[in-house]
Amino acid sequence: MEQKKRSMKQHYQILIVGGGNAGISLAAQLFRKDKRLDIGIMDPADKHYYQPAWTLVGGGDFDVRDTVRSEAEVMPRQAKWIKEAAVKLEPDQNAVISSAGVRYTYDYLVVCPGIQLDWHKIKGIEGHLGKNGITSNYTFETAPYTFECIRSLKRGKALFTNPNTPIKCGGAPQKIMYLASDYWRKHGVLKDIEVHYYSGGGVIFGVKKYADTLLKVIQRYGIKTHYLHNLVEIRPDKKEAVFEVYKDGQVVDQVTDTYDMIHVTPPQSAPDFIKNSPLAVPGNPLGWVDVDKHTFQHVRYPNVYSIGDASSTPNAKTGAAIRKQVPVLVEQLFSQIRAGKPAAAQYNGYGSCPLVTGYGRLVLAEFDYNNQPVETFPFDQSKERWTMYQLKRHVLPWLYWNRILKGTA
């Protein structure tokens, strides 16, 4: 092992931290433009997941086994895979220290390790997730259990939570609630189940055009909404959930509700190794990488970039956003490498959220930094459509594995 460690190449023209959607598709697109590039990808993961399908897994409409492949299978052939985790960023020395204690240096660094799930911020959940009615679509292991909970509930109370931090796939906490409600409606038990949505946010969705449709969906299923309520504790023995209530940014109250099943969306933040580095936004406890929102260039370290869920860009943290971010970053990197200056290419904050509102129903929300719709199709995408559900269920997973990760979409 020591011999292998020493012989491993330790300097890269471009070092990418993170082998998820952002890191793999970025490397693939870079190599398509120039196969001679010297790129290292640092990620310890054995497996690569297609996470957007976990909502459908939780709704019993997608096989969880089809959401995973080996990381080796998606790694671009020309890239050097550093199968270690980043533990320390030293941008003043152009260096990253790995979990193996190796110091890797770079000409350009791209930080895209994804987002961290902060389960520790919910008291009492440790050791109880995935049993006794406590579930989440945010892990590969527990998404199938969500459907078990939905299927077995015939009467009682179901809670669906959304934290007060930015999260990946902002619509996910409510999408599973709509699928569950539709399942119960189809099986004639919705009238015997109280469905509650507890959200740390202040609105159902940030873009009015789509929010108007979602409010009708909520009405259709008889869902009770509680905004500015943030889950802080679960008491599994009593089947109770505790929420802090916010007003004007301050906690003003604490409320407790009972549940028979609870779908939890954990608070999220940048990984700790970013929070504890000079790359994080100063004074922001969530620790996002501090970059220009149009070019992804770090505001203090010009040879450092960040895209995807860990960056400070204020867009929706979705795979669709990454798909629009990657070509811009490719242009920026090539311009820096070849001409020593930024490219004209800019990112407009595009994000997309395929909002599942029931089985065979979907609202395809697409919007920019100004929360203005930027729609792909020539019809009104705020309407629930069967065709858009098929897009999410069949087309997008294929596109991900066969085009996006290969740098051709």
Regions found by a protein language model. Give the residues of each.
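Beta1-alpha1 glycine-rich phosphate/pyrophosphate-binding loop at the start
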Residues: 2-80, 164-208
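FAD-binding core/adjacent interface of flavoenzyme oxidoreductases
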Residues: 2-12, 79-175, 179-188, 263
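Glycine-rich, N-terminal phosphate-binding loop of Rossmann-like dinucleotide-binding domains
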Residues: 19, 100, 113-114, 245, ...
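A Rossmann-like FAD-binding core segment of flavoenzymes
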Residues: 36, 79-89, 104, 185-286, ...
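FAD-site-proximal beta/loop scaffold in flavoenzymes
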Residues: 127-154, 258-324
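Rossmann-like dinucleotide-binding core of oxidoreductases
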Residues: 152-226, 318-352
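C-terminal, flexible cofactor-proximal segment of oxidoreductases
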Residues: 330-409
